[in-house]
């Protein structure tokens, strides 16, 4: 069905919490070499994960809109994942379910939409050009298709620079959750010009 002019609720009561929780410190000093065996091993350990889920705080900030929400991200198999955005009261604002060749999105009115491109659909429905295809790798601490990136002193991603479709994304990682094995990102910030996406992961469950 046609995609309407759909917007998420501006969840202002959550603003201070998210902006504080998602503050990211730019890495300082030289990091480890991307050619190091430790980095290759870390990437392999992450790619070996069959299933994982994380939840936390989400913020999208641009000149046009500000969106704050809680998020839940779950991957159950290759190219099978679920993204849920909720407001402070726990009500669902957006639910996206993706599998190979089919993506379904349900908005906060219960309206269902289908597509074969999750990134394009979520952009049209929300007005937020989230680089979802790349973010699926970045949220795991993997560079995806990016070749311009830096590592921290623990052989993990600290920064990514990636250009695609007229967008120039810079991704900065503010820390990692070492309670999981392998260690997973704890918070990150994506910027492209005047727009920012902030994610703070409260916890990870990996298998």
UniProtKB/Swiss-Prot annotation:
Keywords annotated in UniProt? Cell outer membrane, Chaperone, Lipoprotein, Membrane, Palmitate, Protein transport, Signal, Transport
Q: Signal peptide position in this chain?
A: 1-21
Principal location: membrane
Spell out the GO cellular component terms annotated for this protein, sorted alphabetically and separated by semicolons. Answer: cell outer membrane
Q: Which InterPro entries match?
A: LolA/LolB/LppX, OM_lipoprot_LolB
UniProt cross-references to Pfam families, sorted A to Z = LolB (PF03550)
For this chain, the annotated S-S bridges are none
CDD domains to which the protein is assigned, alphabetical: LolB (cd16326)
Q: What does this protein do?
A: Plays a critical role in the incorporation of lipoproteins in the outer membrane after they are released by the LolA protein.
Subunit record text: Monomer.
Protein name in UniProt: Outer-membrane lipoprotein LolB
Gene name in the database record: lolB
């Amino acid at each position: 069905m046609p995609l309407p002019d759909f917007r998420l609720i501006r969840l202002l009561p959550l603003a201070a919490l998210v902006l504080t929780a998602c503050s990211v410190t730019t890495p300082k000093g030289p990091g480890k070499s991307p050619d190091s065996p430790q980095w290759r091993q870390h990437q392999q350990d992450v790619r070996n994960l069959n299933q994982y889920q994380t939840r936390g705080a989400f913020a999208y900030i641009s000149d046009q809109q500000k969106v704050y929400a809680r998020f839940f991200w779950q991957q159950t198999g290759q190219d099978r994942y679920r993204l849920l955005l909720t407001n402070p009261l726990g009500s669902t604002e957006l639910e996206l379910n993706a599998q190979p060749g089919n993506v379904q999105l349900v908005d906060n009115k219960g309206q269902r939409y289908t597509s074969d491109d999750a990134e394009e659909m979520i952009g049209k429905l929300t007005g937020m050009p989230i680089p979802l295809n790349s973010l699926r790798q970045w949220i795991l601490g993997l560079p995806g298709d990016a070749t311009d990136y830096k590592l921290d002193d623990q052989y993990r991603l600290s920064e990514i620079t990636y250009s695609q479709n007229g967008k120039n994304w810079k991704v900065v990682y503010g820390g990692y959750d070492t309670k999981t094995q392998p260690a997973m990102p704890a918070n990150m910030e994506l910027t492209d010009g005047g727009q920012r996406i902030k994610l703070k992961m409260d916890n990870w469950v990996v298998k």
